[in-house]
Amino acid sequence: MAQFYSAKRRTTTRQIITVSVNDLDSFGQGVARHNGKTLFIPGLLPQENAEVTVTEDKKQYARAKVVRRLSDSPGRETPRCPHFGVCGGCQQQHASVDLQQRSKSAALARLMKHEVSEVIADVPWGYRRRARLSLNYLPKTQQLQMGFRKAGSSDIVDVKQCPILVPQLEALLPKVMACLGSLQVMRHLGHVELVQATSGTLMILRHTAPLSSADREKLERFSHSEGLDLYLAPDSEILETVSGEMPWYDSNGLRLTFSPRDFIQVNAGVNQKMVARALEWLDVQPEDRVLDLFCGMGNFTLPLATQAASVVGVEGVPALVEKGQQNARLNGLQNVTFYHENLEEDVTKQPWAKNGFDKVLLDPARAGAAGVMQQIIKLEPIRIVYVSCNPATLARDSEALLKAGYTIARLAMLDMFPHTGHLESMVLFSRVK
């Protein structure tokens, strides 16, 4: 949602007003109207009335805070997490999953000017298989903080539980905190990452000063007692494997290895369903030549290769291209070619662009795929699946395809991050004959 900021903050009288909320935005704020202006109120849900005071008044919108809630929405629920409202991780735990999905689907439909065909979802709790926890030493108390950032702040919320983490990771939180808080180097710790792979649990510790032999021994004992693969990161380039083999996870019948620092989808359940639905929408045939743009380490590329005659994956990060090639070999897939190319540059001169393709899949970052849309149109694929983590750039890029004669055949909201403001989606475009 675009928000416009004027140079000067308007003064408010703190007058109490009564409002009726009619919508929920992606940040979990109730949306109401007052004096012809949109009013955003944290903590309120659709169908709720409340007394509020305006805290910020802009030309296009205003913000308010609740003085007293006068009624409860049928979609209101008690948040499961004791840190909700302070921790910046979740914005919508006070809303039912059904309300969250309906609100996100409605927002997607408005942007795309097309009805949402389906919601692709999995378990709403215990879904996140990766967590990055900030670490901060407090000199006054000589204690170590471990947790997530506060909403709108760089301060850390000490987190002892997190119900959106997979149970294995949530159970580890107090144990990891106790271990790290006993280290001599705790003044020089940056963050700790926990990852749950199919192969086991990973812990990656970022430290900014050398570890003493005693600290190293403590960490090794902890990793062995908890059955963790331990990795140490003294800087952003170096990653030392202390214990454990190359991690891997199952994806649509394939075994994919990855580096602990590689990007993998944090919601394994939705990822499996998303990949399966993409293959179904593309209707991949044994004779098809398929192009996968922004392919990463092959999340879609490799499953596509199990059904198509040939698949080309294009990715801008060399380490991910190398990992995709390695996983193709490990899974015995010989019909895959990966290219390391910057898709934000002139793609017409890149080697993959000279090939012909029957079908195309693209999964760009938040900036979208404006630089490749014309090249995709030139290829004249029968079907295109666009996976998006930013509905605004998806809507922008879709215009090029619609003008070129494609139509939206299917539109899905991907509930990849329940209880948060993140909205992901997937669209099938078909060429009009």
From Swiss-Prot:
PROSITE patterns: SAM_MT_RNA_M5U (PS51687), TRAM (PS50926), TRMA_1 (PS01230), TRMA_2 (PS01231). The keyword Membrane does not apply. It holds the Pfam family TRAM. S-adenosyl-L-methionine binds at residues 265, 294, 299, 315, 342, 363. Residues 10-68 form the TRAM domain. Gene3D superfamilies: 2.40.50.1070, Nucleic acid-binding proteins, Vaccinia Virus protein VP39. It comes from the Bacteria. It comes from Shigella sonnei (strain Ss046). [4Fe-4S] cluster binds at residues 81, 87, 90, 162. It catalyses: uridine(1939) in 23S rRNA + S-adenosyl-L-methionine = 5-methyluridine(1939) in 23S rRNA + S-adenosyl-L-homocysteine + H(+). Its EC number is 2.1.1.190. One of its GO terms (biological process) is rRNA base methylation. Belongs to the class I-like SAM-binding methyltransferase superfamily. RNA M5U methyltransferase family. RlmD subfamily. The keyword Zinc does not apply. InterPro entries: 23S_rRNA_MeTrfase_RlmD (IPR001566), MeTrfase_TrmA_AS (IPR030390), MeTrfase_TrmA_CS (IPR030391), NA-bd_OB-fold (IPR012340), SAM-dependent_MTases_sf (IPR029063), TRAM_dom (IPR002792), U5_MeTrfase_fam (IPR010280). Catalyzes the formation of 5-methyl-uridine at position 1939 (m5U1939) in 23S rRNA. Keywords: 4Fe-4S, Iron, Iron-sulfur, Metal-binding, Methyltransferase, rRNA processing, S-adenosyl-L-methionine, Transferase. The active site is at residue 389. GO terms for molecular function: 4 iron, 4 sulfur cluster binding; iron ion binding; RNA binding; rRNA (uridine-C5-)-methyltransferase activity. This is 23S rRNA (uracil(1939)-C(5))-methyltransferase RlmD.
